[in-house]
């Protein structure tokens, strides 16, 4: 499969383009609004073609799919533009800035006959796959989930992640992982209560703490921040045991990963060989395109996660719990 890369964002340059190149697929073209920047990245990574506009890349008839690592607030427009060209789309999380917009871009891609998948790479790591398997089959009913993804964004940073016009904020950048993990183990919550704080007077949340409640009695606590040392974990308490992954999301592809769980009076730590989650994500996306199968991160999951994020922001604004239908 021939991939075009819309933008020269760090996650693409450092992780996704190398993942495409390590697979049986090809990063065939890259675009930037700064043609010199596109050419420099193309030369550095061995990409055959560089374009000075996103429109020019989308007009390249040799491409089968695009990867979109643009700022959050630009995702929806470029997903639609790619679909108009008949290109399949792997788009960075969060897919859009709201649940309604997420549903709308899935509708658009379905009408265009192209596959759309949101790029939550951690969902493709064997650690996550095993955690989901254990919770579903061996540990009993889930009582609670606690998940946090935080890191320290340098003070004074001129960064798209704190730009309100580009759908920035800690929830959109890393809190979405915590919400995704809660959904993986518990599903969509029935109500949400959350607080957010803008510690930098930048117009977006730089800290979030939320409680997701379920009619079953289960709860999830989700947190994110731009103000603390890096933290990325989930912990699951069940009726018959517990489970923890730390680190859980952006796992070093050159290092082994560990998953610890307890049940029947024993504690087990499973170790996973170094794994490139991004490569597995790319391969899974391409397989979905080629076979017509539903992507692992599908419409239902993407809309559900975004509905919860919408509720987090609404609750933080109103100070009240938000019911999800």
Curated annotation (Swiss-Prot):
Disruption phenotype annotation: Does not affect growth on D-xylose as sole energy and carbon substrate.
Catalytic reactions on record: D-xylose + NADP(+) = D-xylono-1,5-lactone + NADPH + H(+)
Entry EC no(s): 1.1.1.179
Any matching Pfam family: GFO_IDH_MocA
Keyword vocabulary terms for this entry: NADP, Oxidoreductase, Plasmid, Secreted, Signal
Major place of residence: secreted
Any one GO CC term of the record: extracellular region
One GO MF term: nucleotide binding
Stimuli inducing this protein: Expression is highly induced during growth on D-xylose.
Leader sequence residues: 1-22
Record localization: Secreted
PANTHER family reported for this sequence: OXIDOREDUCTASES, TRANS-1,2-DIHYDROBENZENE-1,2-DIOL DEHYDROGENASE
Protein family according to the UniProt entry: Belongs to the Gfo/Idh/MocA family.
Role description: NADP-dependent D-xylose dehydrogenase involved in the degradation of D-xylose, a major component of hemicelluloses such as xylan. Even if it shows D-xylose dehydrogenase activity, it is not essential for D-xylose degradation.
Subunit structure comment from the entry: Homotetramer.
Protein name per its UniProtKB record: D-xylose 1-dehydrogenase (NADP(+)) 2
Source taxonomy: Archaea, Methanobacteriati, Methanobacteriota, Stenosarchaea group, Halobacteria
